Structures are given as C-alpha cells and as structure tokens.
Regions:
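Basic, polyanion-binding surface patches
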Residues: 1-162
Length: 162
C-alpha cells in the first residue's frame, strides 16, 4: 500500500570511519539508502538526514561527523535496493553494487562517481527521533553534475521517476 507521504526522493548517503570489528580496527566505507531527508536552512546551508538506530551508518556518522548526500538517477535503482538491504557491517557496498568511490572535496568521506549531484556535510547537530537519529549537516561543498531523472521511493521495492 502506498504511503501517504510518498513517493520520496531516494538518495545514497556515504560515510567513512575506522571501526572495531571482532577486536580488529579497520576503515569502513559505507553507503546507506535514505528516503527521509531534507534541506533545513539557507543561511547557513544545512541538510538533514534520518538514519535508523540499528544501521551501521549511524555509528560511522556519529564518530566521523561527516557524510555525503549523493543524488542518484533512476538507473541506479538496483544499487539503491542493494544498499538498503545489505548491512555495512558485513558487506562492502561499493563492491556489491559496482559503484565507483571518489574522494570528497572538503570532508574525509567518499562520494559516488555515478551520482548526478552531491552535498558534502559536516555534522553540527544530532536529534534523537524515536527509532531514528536525525543528523543535521552544514553543507561544505555542493555540486550538480547533470540533470537526469531522479529516483523516488514509493513503498517496498517500488520506485518512480520524475
């Protein structure tokens, strides 16, 4: 059944941090599919994302204080599904999806080469919101590379485009 507040534009959020797994520290690059996000201020330019408390990306963003909002075209629908279903604790989502990792311009965080645009964000506030945490990030760099049909999530595995 469609949700009252959908469809919502789907983004891929990337993040990076050193985390401890099974007694070993390793650098983790992760991608999470997010449909709950929005601009929250023009001056300064702020953007908010909502991450579930059980997600691996939550710990990464809390520690690193940075994330990249990757706006994706409709043709990356399968990558969005993979990144929404697999856990970053057990999978390298860049390898699983075939997406290309690039370094960001102003923060220590990867971005996705195939994205049509980016917002590089430094976390300035965390808000506890039930079973999610809302991260408010100050946008340190933004770029729109091309204007393509974007991906919108309806419900389940169903998507639309513009």
């Amino acid at each position: 059944m469609p949700e009252v507040y959908g469809p919502r534009q789907t983004i891929l959020v990337t993040c990076r941090e050193e985390l401890e797994f099974m007694g070993k520290t390793k650098e983790v690059h992760n991608i999470i599919t997010v449909a709950w996000h929005m601009p929250v201020s023009h001056d300064p330019l702020l953007y908010a994302i909502s991450i579930g408390k059980t997600r691996a990306s939550l710990e990464i963003i809390k520690k690193s204080k940075g994330f990249v909002v990757n706006f994706i075209p409709f043709e990356l629908k399968e990558a969005a599904l993979i990144c929404g279903k697999l856990s970053g604790r057990h999978h390298d989502k860049f390898k699983e999806t075939g997406l290309t990792m690039e370094e960001s311009n102003h923060i220590d965080c990867p971005k996705i080469k195939e994205a049509i645009g980016y917002l590089e964000c430094h976390v300035i506030e965390e808000v506890d919101a039930g079973d999610h945490v809302i991260f408010i990030g100050e946008v340190t760099y933004q770029q729109l590379k091309e204007d393509k049909d974007r991906l919108f999530h309806c419900s389940g595995d169903k998507f639309k485009t513009t």
